[in-house]
Amino acid sequence: ILAGGETAEMPGVVPESIVELSGFCIGCCEKSKLIDPKTVRPGDVFIGYKSDSFHANGWSLIRRILEENPDVVDEEELRSLLQPTRLYHDVVADMRRFNVTPKAYAHITGGGLPENLERFLGDYGADLSIPYWDNTAAQKILKHVDPQDRFNTFNMGIGWVAIVRPEDAEAALKAGPGGTVIGTLREGRGIHVKVQGE
């Protein structure tokens, strides 16, 4: 058993006495090609890449919202929420093709942007401004979530983040579809997120 980030608790989904088996894969990399988040410095640029939906996190809350508000989304919108988690291998492959070595990557899972970025930034932080998430079904769900809690539960339309040197930002924006600058690294702990225009 390899227990780690992909060991999920799913209250209300997996009944008692049932064991769910899941598959996973492990990648490998030459040591010389590994990236080191300890190299991040103020001024480094956060590039956010679009998510396809809520991906694999926040579903206990989503199910509760749907149970309490069964007509909040129609069947087609519900199916759109079930898009598989995007894996962002295209972004990583393009970064290598463009000779961009990011300082760090973050897959935005449970805990949203704040938790997934704060865990490796140490004494640094950022004030992030993300685009409005143009996903009708997701927005209907989010109307039932506390405005601040949404940032700490969901990916809010940004499923992957690369932190790059300022001189690499233009190339990094071309890596995979959906890249956008969402902020820069600063001194001082804490990730604060707002939606552009709110």
Language-model features: where?
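Short, compositionally biased
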Residues: W59-P70
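Basic, gly/Ser/Thr/Pro-rich low-complexity segments located predominantly at protein N termini
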Residues: E9-M10, S32, H55, R63, ...
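Glycine-/charge-enriched secondary-structure boundary and capping motifs
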Residues: V14-V19, N69-L82, R86-E198
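Glycine-rich anion-binding loops of enzyme active sites
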Residues: I1-W59, T184, Q196
